[in-house]
Amino acid sequence: MFWTIFMALTDLVVPQAVVPSLRVNSKKQALQELAARAAAICGRNEREVLEVLMQRERLGSTGVGSGIAIPHGKLARLERLSGVFARLERPIDFEALDGQPVDLVFLLLAPEGAGADHLKALARIARLLRDPEIAQKLRESRDAEALYAVLAGHSTKAS
């Protein structure tokens, strides 16, 4: 499938899905804002997207550490993997594994049947965003174009 050939973060995120300075005060508010953006981009119901994300969060936080969260979920009738990236104005508590507040969030939605592709995408996103050099560039970028350029500049060949 898609991930067996090549993966760049820009294969998941269109320029309109990059939020350079999201002002939120809580994990719930962040998920609501990102769900709204993802729903608009995917042509889905905002409530449906938020519910999928909240169901996943109830299983355990998607705050992976180092100031990064990767909320994700699967949706029926979604055509392809799709994402939204946001740099938060101020770090928030995301109940991350390392207890650190989160300021970089990559929301990933996958088709219900994505299976291994969904897991591979999550692993690659985590690996790329936890790279200190990439994370620093993302934190220093102040507009959507600059953030998208950082995301576009980092890809990985499938293994």
Task: List the predicted regions and their residue ranges.
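Cytosolic covalent-transfer regions centered on His/Cys nucleophiles
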Residues: 1-159
